[in-house]
A protein has these predicted regions:
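Short alpha-helical segments that sit at the start of domains
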Residues: 144-161
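Cyclic-nucleotide recognition modules
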Residues: 74-132
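Short beta-strand segments in beta-sandwich/barrel cores
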Residues: 33, 42, 60-65, 83, ...
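Glycine- and acidic-residue-biased ligand/ion/polar-headgroup-sensing regions
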Residues: 51-64, 79-81
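Cyclic nucleotide-binding regulatory module and flanking cytosolic helices
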Residues: 1-34, 38, 83, 88-92
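Short phosphate-coordinating micro-motif centered on Lys-Gly-acidic
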Residues: 43-48
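Phosphate-/nucleic-acid-contacting segments
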Residues: 154, 162-223
Length: 223
């Protein structure tokens, strides 16, 4: 993707791009790069350099937190057309916790340098508003995840995960039990046990490499 194509891609973010002067647009383009991440590749973590704001063109990013023991809890995903702003947490004074970002699929992003983004925030009120809006959206996602973990039973959390995958990708879900456990902040054995129960209830069919949702109505009754 050349610079002209990057500008055309960024123009879809009207709240951001639509309020920039020609000089500011040139500054943005000078401080962006097109990057492709492979499935499972770490994009951002506390140990890596501050990546910047990620505008997702293709694929999917997973944003998560991790305990000292290595237990992961997925906070949210960033899909095509969406923005990952917590990957620029080093220049966002309101963000005081470490997050990790991995690529789930072959993912294409336009990366806006974190420090250039901070400079834009200080000079353009619309960019500051865009930043605040993105943070509010992601904070809402984080609170939804915390609500599920704290107040929902595991069978309901698993049902929500399966239903969201059904809506997004259809009835065939190609995630391992370990991957689902990471998304839900649980153990693989717990996921396997609950999927086996769902299978006995006629909700899913579980095979070695995939899970098939066979009764959407029964699944929705678990939500």
């Amino acid at each position: 993707m050349n610079k002209k194509e990057q500008m055309e891609f960024l123009s879809q973010y009207e709240d951001f791009w639509g309020h920039l002067s020609d000089e500011e647009k040139e500054f943005v383009c000078h401080n962006t790069e097109f990057v492709t991440y492979h499935p499972g590749q770490n994009v951002h973590s506390a140990d890596l350099r501050c990546v910047g704001v990620l505008f997702v063109r293709k694929g999917c990013l997973r944003v998560y937190i991790m305990s000292e023991e290595g237990k992961e809890v997925t906070l949210y995903r960033v899909n095509p057309g969406e923005v990952c702003i917590l990957s620029a947490s080093c220049v966002l004074s309101e963000i005081t916790f470490d997050v990790y970002v991995d690529s789930e699929d072959l993912t294409e992003v336009v990366v806006f340098n974190a420090f250039a983004f901070a400079k834009m925030i200080s000079k353009n009120i619309y960019v500051e508003n865009f930043s605040n809006k993105m943070k509010a959206i992601r904070f809402s996602d984080v609170m939804w995840t915390m609500q599920q973990i704290l107040f929902f039973s595991f069978d309901k959390r698993l049902a929500i995960f399966l239903y969201e995958e059904l809506i997004k990708n259809g009835p065939i879900i190609r995630y391992s039990h370990m991957e689902i456990a990471k998304y839900l902040g649980s153990a693989r054995e717990v996921v396997s046990r609950m999927l086996k129960y769902f299978e006995k209830e006629g909700i899913v069919l579980v095979s070695r490499k995939e899970i098939e949702i066979v009764d959407k109505k029964k699944l929705m009754e678990r939500l």
